[in-house]
């Protein structure tokens, strides 16, 4: 059964990229399955430069330079959405609203702002529960 059939684009979280580019990650197998569907369905991959930064840093420190470097060489495959100052302020407000009670990062808050705004609520691929708790359509 196809999880992604019918979608033209998806937003990729750092947790998806980390799982996809590290064979040691607990979600690696699932990330590969999703990536095969993405290729088969010709789905566009959207993300943000904040996500790319987070993913390459986690890959480097958790799994090593090779994984981080291979991911870095792939960034031309993704449509990186550029953020505006007003979106940073919206993300900070969301972070301040939820950050005290849960472990929501600023990057997750900014992703929410981008997905619900300029990206018109496209689904997100994430193994991070924060996306689901923020009310985003999340595939994992």
Residue ranges with predicted function:
Residues 1-46, 60-70:
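Short, well-structured N-terminal submotif of metal-dependent ribonuclease cores
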Residues 1-9, 112-113, 118-140:
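Acidic, PIN/NYN-like endoribonuclease modules and their adjacent C-terminal/linker elements
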Residues 10-13, 47-48, 104-106, 128, ...:
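Histidine- and aromatic-rich ligand-binding microenvironments
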Residues 40-45, 77-79, 119-122:
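Short active-site oxyanion
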Residues 74, 79-88, 103, 131-140:
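Conserved N-terminal glycine/acidic-rich loop preference
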Residues 80-123:
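Active-site neighborhoods of divalent-metal-dependent phosphate/nucleic-acid chemistry enzymes
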């Amino acid at each position: 059964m196809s999880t992604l059939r019918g979608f033209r684009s998806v937003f990729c979280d750092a947790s998806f990229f980390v799982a996809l580019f590290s064979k040691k990650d607990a979600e690696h197998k699932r990330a590969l399955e999703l990536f095969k569907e993405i290729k088969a369905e010709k789905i566009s991959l959207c993300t943000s430069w904040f996500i790319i930064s987070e993913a390459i840093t986690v890959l480097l420190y958790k799994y090593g330079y090779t994984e981080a470097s291979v991911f870095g060489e792939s960034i031309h495959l993704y449509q990186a959405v550029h953020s505006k100052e007003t979106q940073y302020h919206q993300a900070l407000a969301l972070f301040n609203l939820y950050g005290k009670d849960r472990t929501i990062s600023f990057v997750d808050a900014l992703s929410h702002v981008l997905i619900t705004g300029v990206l018109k609520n496209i689904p997100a691929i994430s193994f991070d529960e924060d996306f689901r708790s923020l009310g985003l359509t999340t595939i994992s």
